[in-house]
Regions:
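Beta-sheet entry/capping signal
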Residues: 45-47, 67-71, 113-117, 125, ...
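Conserved Class I SAM-dependent methyltransferase catalytic core
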Residues: 92-146
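Conserved nucleotide-binding/hydrolysis micro-motifs of P-loop NTPases
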Residues: 77-78, 122-125, 149-152, 175-179
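DnaQ-like (DEDDh/DEDDy) 3′-5′ exonuclease domain used for proofreading
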Residues: 1-72, 79-94, 98-101
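Flexible, glycine/threonine-enriched loop-and-boundary segments that flank and lead into catalytic domains
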Residues: 51-54, 59, 149-151, 155-158
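Flexible, glycine-/basic-rich loop-and-beta segments that form/coincide
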Residues: 152-211
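Short, solvent-exposed loop/turn and secondary-structure capping segments
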Residues: 81-86, 128-130, 144, 156-157, ...
Length: 211
């Protein structure tokens, strides 16, 4: 990676795993899809991949490089706890290296209008943002959304320290100048009498709205 004026460094940053080209093999016993298409837009190319996610990303790169529109990842929060299926207590430099290796491939998979969502808590939030600024570009950071993940009840209510109830979604665009979010509207069964005006052409860009 090209050196920048401002960057996050850690022990072992220059160490890179050697990734050979990989292929994905279908397990016919576990595969299933409908025998027919309901519409012409139906897709039969969804995949559930079992294995190391770094190797899986590498295997997808040849076919999907520059094509992925949306990526959502939920990496280990590095809470210093040991769970049944994975260790969530990695040393910080190891965690950063693992994240860097995967995020670099994810960036190559994304198309120019793509969006990346990373779900994280406060343990590594600060380091993650700086790492993503370096990989995706600080100018491509869209937002950091805070959402309520829990409540100060139960065992948390007797915690003598600060109680954490929030998680975060860190959002980056592949190329923010051409990135456009999809607007979401919720239909109402009846007219909301609090409003006296209606947008007649809400599908248009907002400067062209007619009331």
């Amino acid at each position: 990676m090209k050196k920048q004026k401002l960057e996050l460094t850690w022990i072992g940053k220059e160490d890179r795993p050697r990734l050979e080209p990989r292929i994905l093999l279908e397990d016919q016993d576990l595969s299933y899809h409908s025998g027919y298409r309901v519409t012409e837009e139906d897709l039969f190319d969804n995949r559930l991949i079992f294995g190391d996610n770094l190797l899986a990303l590498k295997a997808l790169e040849h076919e999907f490089s520059g094509k992925v529109k949306c990526v959502y990842i939920d990496p280990p929060f590095n809470t210093q706890q040991a769970f049944e299926h994975y260790d969530d207590g990695l040393e910080h430099s190891i965690w950063l290296g693992l994240m860097r290796d995967r995020l670099e491939i994810i960036k190559r998979l994304m198309n120019n209008e793509g969006t990346l969502f990373v779900h994280i808590d406060d343990n590594e939030l600060g380091y993650l943002i700086v790492l993503l600024d370096e990989i995706m570009g600080r100018s491509n950071r869209v937002a950091v959304i805070t959402f309520k993940q829990g409540s100060a009840t139960g065992h948390k209510s007797i915690n003598p320290g600060v109680v954490t109830t929030s998680n975060f979604l860190v959002i980056y665009a592949k190329n923010k100048p051409i990135w456009t979010p999809n607007r979401l509207f919720t239909a109402r069964a009846e007219r909301d009498k609090r409003y006296s005006q209606f947008i007649m052409n809400y599908e248009s860009h907002f400067p062209k709205w007619q009331f």
